[in-house]
Curated annotation (Swiss-Prot):
Alphabetized SUPFAM superfamilies for the sequence: L28p-like
Protein name: Large ribosomal subunit protein bL31B
Natural source organism: Clavibacter sepedonicus (Clavibacter michiganensis subsp. sepedonicus)
PROSITE patterns with a match to the protein in the record: RIBOSOMAL_L31
Subunit structure: Part of the 50S ribosomal subunit.
Family to which the UniProt record says this protein belongs: Belongs to the bacterial ribosomal protein bL31 family. Type B subfamily.
Keywords tagged on the record: Ribonucleoprotein, Ribosomal protein
Gene Ontology, cellular component aspect: ribonucleoprotein complex; ribosome
UniProt-listed Pfam families: Ribosomal_L31
Annotated GO biological process: translation
Gene Ontology molecular function: any one: structural constituent of ribosome
């Protein structure tokens, strides 16, 4: 097996910017920013805009769009389109 071909796999903190939640996990991603975790150790921190803590699919706060009104509006706007005069 070849040595030194695998990326560095280390503990990393992911911080959700939308909810402020933080997750400690292992990853190959690195960052120059660091944070002190609850255990007192310092880890690299990666800021993410959305995670399972703030995504509507996982939080159950999904909005269902009313597409029926949009279809009717489209049909009324283009009802006579393509007919010869």
């Amino acid at each position: 097996m070849k040595t030194d071909i695998h990326p560095k796999y280390a503990p990393v903190v992911f911080r959700d910017l939308a909810s402020g939640a933080t997750f400690l996990t292992r990853s190959t991603v690195s960052s120059s920013k660091t944070i002190v975790w609850e255990d007192g150790n310092e880890y690299a921190v990666i800021d993410v805009e959305i995670s399972s803590e703030s995504h509507p699919f996982y939080t159950g706060k999904q909005r269902i769009m009313d597409s029926a009104g949009r279809v009717e509006k489209f049909n009324s706007r283009y009802a006579g389109f393509g007919t010869k005069k």
